[in-house]
Amino acid sequence: MVSTKGRLVVDPEYLDLLAQSNCVVQVSMVCSKYDPLEPGTPPYEERLKIVETLAGRVQRVIVRIQPYMPEVFKDVMANIPRLAAAGVYGVVVEGMKFYKAKKGMVKIGGDHCYPLNVLRPHFEAIKAECHRHGLKFYAGENRLRAMGDSMTCCGIDGLEGFKGNEYNLCMLMNGQNPEPTELMKQIGTGGCFQSLNQIAGINKKINNQSFYGLMQEELGGKLDYYKKMFGLDE
């Protein structure tokens, strides 16, 4: 998996290497209106040419419409047939997250986000237009993840040689009932939880538990919090 907004991926030496690999390439590109916000990066139209070059050489090209803002809805919709013509496999869409509070936003965890009643109709329209042109649609927005053609939103779904980690809170909260791997059940596999629990003595507790056990504990103790995070409280 390669994710970029740069032009280096189509330099011959790197393009040849990607062509020899079982590789999905993601390119971040929303629309031309974002060009002034990203000085030093290729403008949208150049990225479209980059995508077209990549599409014939790699397993899949995924366009990341991230971060999405409702103000560019018409631009995004108008570009979907162009993405299909360029050989794109699918798009992943996620709403903009703001650090500071803004009027009309809702606070989700540490972010200020667009409310679902704003994002949902946009996502539904974008999804329908993608399908009309033969593109896959993925929702990078946690609260709308289940809208996607796969809840593994990076674009690797069904591709030989790739297997996503389905045992995550997003899957569990959306009723997918994924099974943990045997390794996840082994004691001492929950190290990633140390970053979520930075309190004295927590390392000893985590080291004596499994990833699976800590996931169940996390879900059971913060159910209302995660319902809000994954848009299931409305």
Where are these regions (language model features)?
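Conserved AdoMet/S-adenosylmethionine-binding subsite of the radical SAM
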Residues: 1-122, 129
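C-terminal accessory extensions appended to soluble enzyme cores
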Residues: 103-234
